[in-house]
Regions:
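Active-site nucleotide/adenylate-binding loops and adjacent lid/helix of ATP-dependent enzymes
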Residues: 1-8, 15-111, 156-163
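ATP-dependent carboxylate activation and anion-phosphoryl transfer catalytic cores
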Residues: 156-224
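Phosphate-binding site of ATP-dependent enzymes
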Residues: 77-172, 193
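Short glycine-enriched loops at secondary-structure junctions
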Residues: 17-20, 131-132, 185-187
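Short strand-connecting beta-turns/loops that link adjacent beta-strands
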Residues: 69, 121, 189-190
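A short, surface-exposed helix-loop junction/capping segment
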Residues: 13, 69-71, 143-147
């Protein structure tokens, strides 16, 4: 689809950027760039599943998800439920996915996530997203989880982390994308870590800042 659309029109976030970003294995590159990311274990095979089971990873409070998904689809939290976690991972592997396992970040229950939206590499606005994963399968409205979004000013540490991510993206691809969203949460050490980098049609949540739509329009016009 990306190749087809690229020949018919101009993608401001290029096909290569979107293709790279739609697979959460990009997180490994952020780690290699010494950017703080939630600890992430990739499960690619039944052998990997046996290994993490023997290590006791599934006995903890964890989040399991596929590397390629949208709207938290097939994402579940397993709170010290190794049998259910193993079944979920087995389901994802059988479906042909690579899966990831991350420790659940308990600070998210207190203060949610912070999302920062960037247009042409500049921070436009930020917001708070409430915790959406209860233990077990998350509730969904169709394919997408219902989200609680409210205005929030990103902290200095969060902004520094977001800027580091955007600098990495520019260095890797030679330019800033038209739009980007960096979702962060306070990690176990009390400092922000990246949950996700969204470069493929993320929700901008423009409603949290009445000037955000104008900033996005200006960013689009600046590329003409």
């Amino acid at each position: 689809w990306l190749d087809s659309v690229s020949t018919a029109t101009t993608l401001q976030n290029s096909a290569d950027i979107i293709r790279w970003n739609t697979n959460k294995e990009y997180l490994t590159e952020l780690v290699e760039a010494q950017i703080g990311v939630i600890p992430t274990t990739f499960v690619r095979s039944a052998e990997d599943l046996v290994t993490i089971t023997n290590e006791g990873m599934l006995e903890r409070d964890i989040v399991v998800k596929p590397t390629i998904s949208a709207g938290s689809n097939n994402t579940e939290r397993h709170e010290e439920s190794p049998v259910k976690a193993a079944a979920h991972l087995g389901f994802l592997l059988d479906a042909g996915f690579v899966a990831i396992v991350q420790p659940y970040q308990r600070f998210i229950d207190e203060r949610g996530e912070t999302g920062m939206v960037y247009f042409n590499g500049q921070l436009s606005h930020s917001f708070r997203k409430g915790a959406i994963l209860a233990t077990g399968e998350n509730e969904e409205n169709g394919l997408f989880t219902v989200e609680e979004i409210t205005p929030r000013n990103a902290s200095g540490q969060e902004r520094e982390l977001g800027e580091a991510v955007m600098s990495f993206v520019k260095k890797k691809w030679g330019e800033y994308p038209l739009y980007a969203r960096v979702d962060v949460v306070r990690g176990s050490a009390g400092v922000p870590v990246v949950m996700e980098l969204e470069l493929a049609e993320p929700s901008f949540f423009l409603q949290v800042d009445h000037e955000a739509p104008s900033r996005f329009a200006a960013a689009v016009m600046a590329r003409r």
